[in-house]
UniProtKB/Swiss-Prot annotation:
PANTHER family tied to this protein: PHOTOSYSTEM I ASSEMBLY PROTEIN YCF4, PTHR33288
A GO biological-process term: photosynthesis
Protein name: Photosystem I assembly protein Ycf4
Species assigned in the record: Synechococcus sp. (strain ATCC 27144 / PCC 6301 / SAUG 1402/1)
Functional summary from the UniProt entry: Seems to be required for the assembly of the photosystem I complex.
Chief localization: membrane
Amino acid sequence: MPSPVATVETDSLQQPILGSRRPSNYFWAIAVSVGGTGFLLAGLSSYLQVNLLPFSEPTRLAFLPQGLVMGLYGIAAILLASYLWFVISLDVGGGYNAFDRKTQKATIFRWGFPGKNRRVEITYPLSDIQAVRVDIKEGLNPKRALYLKVKGRGDVPLTRVGQPLPLTELESQGAELARFLAVPLEGL
């Protein structure tokens, strides 16, 4: 994740948030696309008795049940890959956190799925922000996240979903944001 961009001249801080365009999502979309295409071509090869895969001999497979099952697995994988590529192209979950002293506003923006909630934008006055909270839970399913404590509302998550941030990066982002907003940093 890129580091936050703070400028003293404009009195603003902007933190980009990586959404579904993570390297792991690209890896899985490519792997499922290639695997699904291979399975579908193997199933079609066994049905048509024409070798559609140059590196193997799927025409030797009996269509029932092996060829049929491989074709169905291929179709399922291609549908899953299509969903992954769709989500990546929309950058679901991506966006930014922007804090501006001139306008006295904090803006949390994320991209969603198509529909009425495609653009999720939440704006708070800076005066309503009470603290920046760091949430760290270690163990089998670790959780490391930054939250804004906003007066009269619940905690607002600021970090991306997915792979937890390294502790040093989480601490430095939290400290920089708390210093910029002149609020306490809680949870460390």
